[in-house]
Amino acid sequence: MMQPMRWLLVPLLLVACEAPPHLTNADGGTLCASAGSAWPEADALFQRDPAWLGADAAYTVDLGKARVLWLFGDTFIARGAVRQRTDAYFIRNSAALQSGSYDPSAASAKFAWKTGGTPSSWFPENGTSWHWPAGGVRLTTRLLLFWTIIHPASNAFGFEAAGPRVVSVDSPDSDPSSWAFTDVKFPTPAFPVALQAPVVSGTYLFVYAIREPGDHHVYIARVPLKGAEVGDFSGTTWYTPDRGWQDVANLGGEPAVVFPGAGTDNAPEFSVQAQKDGTFLAVQSVGFGATQIAVRTAPAPEGPWTAPCAVFQPSESSAQGAFVYAGKGHPGLLGADVVATYAANSLTSGKVLTDMSLYFPRFVKLTAP
């Protein structure tokens, strides 16, 4: 198996090791208008493949015509006919194509990674660096995929985030096995950020950014859709505290922090989606270890955003050594007002290798707030 114990530390790079915060909504209360429930019927989508033995991250992109691209982080691939992780291959990312229905409980999924010799990452490494997914968006004729570059490092974890990588696919209606990736330049601030949670609203593509490595402050950029459709991001601007939208040359400092809170209030993975009433909903995990899934709302992509409000506690958060993370919504999926997933791991050394109930993404049904 390939570096299993280094893998166990992977999410710790991106999460502050603090106790879960006290969750409140925007007016200081503790009640949420939304609620959640587990969805085991949909969980089966990830447990039918004989070789794909689980992964984290779990981002989706609606490709149209009941086709949904799933992007996963660190992944276990069976070495033979036996479905066990103790002797599995370990790769840095994988993908799946959901088809047949936008309802995951009624759909099928075809998983993908590079083959030939031994399994390898679906989105390939670059030398000694690898990539973790950070979401994507289907435009009219173009697919944009967002990744976080991870470098080896001499810190306690052995690696660190090293900025974003954005690639485009010009033929998203074709089979993913035939896709060619073209790098596009996305202007970012002078300090390192990870890009994710792209959402289209009006004539713009909005993209969120997390200061990483750093304090997990969340910022927002917008790109004219006309430019994004042809891979031109030169018109990208960032939302500032007092001067509106500015390009990177005129930022003059840090962009506006759009998510209130700090530490584990600001998860390294989250989603943002437009709601039917014109407002916006963010879904994330909050806390560390025994986390909850929480939501935020805002009237516009740049806010003002509410503080996170807990709506669901995964059953795995009650376990000894719980390590539950990667909560996010999936706006292209049907079966609930909001379909969300989370990843369940363990801080108990080696447990994820033997406990096959862990590390398959879990579905949650949320009611719209």
Model-derived features with residue positions:
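C-terminal motif of bacterial Sec signal peptides marking the signal peptidase cleavage site
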Residues: 14-16
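Bacterial signal peptide processing site
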Residues: 18-20
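Sec-dependent signal peptide recognition
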Residues: 3-10
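Beta-rich carbohydrate-recognition and catalytic domains
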Residues: 23, 28-53, 63-129, 138-189, ...
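Long, low-complexity, proline- and polar/charged-enriched segments
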Residues: 194-201, 209
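Hydrophobic core register within WD40 beta-propeller blades
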Residues: 60, 136, 198, 270-272, ...
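Repeated scaffold domains used in trafficking and secretory/extracellular systems
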Residues: 134, 188-197, 267-270, 324
